[in-house]
């Protein structure tokens, strides 16, 4: 395992814990989905950075591409996946390979998939057959960026990396892949994951702003399948076996300790080389799926998992569930960590997000960020609601709600989020 990656991740955790204030979640149209609430033994798997048009490494599958090997394995177990694909990294030059085993193994300034100078073997642009196979076999495709360029600075591990200059560039990059999938395959993308989970961008924007503009949800993960980290063994066979074990044993131990551990979870996987240019996922995926099968799990796409429940803290047993699901399709009611927090008091900012139209809330916030470089998460919605008399002009976003517009609500028992949403009159 690369010590610099380990050190970077550990350092980031320390900084977050000691120096950085706790992340403040807010109600928005886009939320980060790591898992959902369910008592059913159902979980999802995601596969980043493909499709890969090169064989597994080592190749013990008669020259089949890695993506074909993964699709064959999923089919064997009746499982479905969410393939978080890229478009094409062939524009990511000039560049050079970094040290094998490091985070820069495939490129110092940019990522290259499946490898530097092999860009024509990776991504949706160059792998029409693999994309069509994914779709024909019922898998989901999600947007991991056309060129897989990080959205902003990431000094701990990717300090030398080029990054997108801002909001417009990120929207343009995602739109290229979105358009490709729509025009070539008639497929609508609904989920996305930012390259290397970099969220903060220039100008005060974040990945959430970009995804709100695109109409996406943020697909994260709650369990790391571990296939991307290299072993330190010098012997190639020992290294491969160690990497396979690192993918299988944590899953085995988690299930032995709690058979319901993976209920509603999203498992991260890699559709490509790890940092040592091996593909342990080709050998470990079947072992993982066998384990999950033994414990009675169904492995589905993230989209299907969200049909079970789209929320982290509210499931089908909640009496308000169906209304909340319907509301969340057109209104901002869920926090960015995918929780509803129904029993807490609602604030005026959260009420404004419920009442303001999607385009108004987003466009006004974006305009304010362009103008000043600063904007609160509710500023766009607050601006609209003040102009239209839906909230008092003197109230602040953090104030508690004390009254509701009569025309839009039945009488509420109190102003918890649960009762406000229950009282809201759904549009016909």
What are these regions (language model features)?
Residues 119, 123-127, 133, 146-293, ...:
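Catalytic domains of cell-wall/extracellular-matrix polysaccharide-remodeling enzymes
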Residues 308-428:
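N-terminal propeptides
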Residues 3, 8-159, 165-189, 194, ...:
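Active-site beta->alpha N-cap acidic-glycine motif
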Residues 94-97, 154-157, 230-235, 346-349, ...:
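Short secondary-structure transition/capping segments
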Residues 90-91, 150-151, 198, 227-228, ...:
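Short secondary-structure capping/turn micro-motifs that flank functional sites
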Residues 48-50, 86, 195-197, 270-274, ...:
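Short strand-loop junctions, especially beta-strand C-caps/beta-turns
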Residues 75-79, 135-136, 175, 179-186, ...:
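Sec-exported extracytoplasmic/periplasmic mature domains
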Residues 42, 65-69, 126-129, 165, ...:
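Extracytoplasmic/secreted proteins, especially bacterial periplasmic and envelope-associated proteins
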């Amino acid at each position: 395992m690369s010590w610099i990656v380990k050190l970077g991740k550990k350092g980031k955790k320390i900084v977050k814990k000691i120096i950085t204030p706790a992340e403040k979640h807010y109600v928005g149209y886009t939320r980060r989905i790591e898992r959902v609430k369910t008592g059913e033994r159902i979980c999802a798997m995601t596969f980043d950075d493909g499709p890969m048009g090169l064989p597994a490494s080592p190749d013990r599958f008669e020259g089949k591409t890695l993506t074909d090997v993964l699709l064959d394995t999923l089919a064997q177990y009746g499982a479905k996946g969410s393939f978080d694909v890229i478009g094409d990294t062939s524009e990511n030059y000039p560049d050079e390979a970094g040290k094998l085993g490091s985070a820069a193994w495939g490129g110092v300034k940019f990522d290259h998939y499946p490898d530097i100078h092999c860009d024509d073997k990776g991504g949706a642009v160059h792998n029409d057959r693999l994309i069509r196979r994914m779709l024909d076999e019922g898998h989901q495709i999600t947007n991991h960026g056309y060129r897989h360029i990080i959205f902003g600075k990431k000094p701990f591990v990717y300090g030398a990396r080029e990054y997108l200059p801002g909001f417009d560039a990120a929207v343009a990059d995602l739109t290229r892949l979105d358009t490709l999938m729509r025009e070539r395959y008639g497929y609508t993308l609904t989920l996305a994951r930012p390259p290397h989970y970099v969220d903060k961008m220039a100008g005060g924007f974040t990945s959430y702003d970009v995804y709100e503009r695109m109409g996406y949800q943020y697909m994260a993960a709650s369990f790391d399948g571990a296939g991307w980290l290299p072993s330190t063994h010098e012997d190639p066979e020992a290294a491969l076996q160690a990497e396979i074990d690192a993918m299988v044993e944590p899953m085995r131990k988690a299930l032995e300790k709690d058979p319901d551990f993976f209920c509603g979870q999203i498992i991260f996987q890699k559709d490509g080389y790890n940092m040592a240019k091996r593909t342990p996922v080709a050998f470990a995926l079947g072992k993982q799926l066998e384990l999950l099968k033994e414990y009675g799990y169904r492995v589905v796409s993230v989209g299907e998992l969200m049909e079970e429940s789209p929320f982290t803290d509210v499931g089908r047993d909640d009496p308000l569930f169906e209304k909340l699901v319907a509301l969340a399709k057109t209104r901002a009611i869920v926090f960015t960590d995918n929780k509803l927090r129904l029993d807490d008091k609602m604030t005026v900012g959260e009420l404004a997000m419920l009442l303001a139209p999607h385009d108004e809330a987003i466009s006004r916030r974006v305009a304010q960020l362009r103008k000043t470089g600063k904007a609160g998460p509710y500023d766009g919605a607050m601006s609209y609601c003040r102009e239209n008399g839906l909230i008092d002009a003197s109230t602040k976003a953090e104030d508690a709600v004390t009254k509701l517009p009569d025309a839009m609500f039945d009488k509420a028992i109190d102003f918890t989020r649960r009762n406000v949403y229950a009282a809201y009159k759904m549009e016909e």
